């Protein structure tokens, strides 16, 4: 779980934070940092196209949580919770890596694209849909929040 902490400090705290201080569009900055996050997992066991896409989408989701709060606590918490639920609680592989003993034991009838196969939940179509929906919700919330703060008159 310390890996999640290190990844968030590096990917969101440093890389996305620096990109947001350039003239680059915030969504392009978010995409670039998410792509680097996905590439960070390039040599994980059992990586294929769908898990790589989901890692990119997860990078967008977690990155958006930083983009709209500018607080590392939110993305770190999301990432830790995500990994903790998958591995130590449900017994899934986390990004292709086995966590060993878990609180619950999943008995999947077969490994396929619905359950993520050997890569774990992050290799599933369900994860793809979940990451897209969560990213849209974070961006919607963040844009709405920014619009409200811009509409409020500034005091002298």
Model feature map: region roles:
Residues 12, 41, 79, 83:
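Histidine-centered divalent metal-coordination motifs
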Residues 40-49:
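Membrane-interface helix caps and helix-loop-helix hairpins in membrane proteins
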Residues 51-112:
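Functionally important transmembrane alpha-helices
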Residues 42, 87-91, 136-140:
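Membrane-embedded alpha-helical segments of multi-pass transporters/permeases
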Residues 6-32, 64-71:
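Membrane-interface helix/loop boundary segments of multi-pass membrane proteins
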Residues 2, 111-132:
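Hydrophobic alpha-helical transmembrane segments
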Residues 1, 5, 31-35, 52, ...:
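Residue-level signature of the transmembrane alpha-helical core
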Residues 137-152:
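Membrane-interface capping segments at transmembrane-helix boundaries
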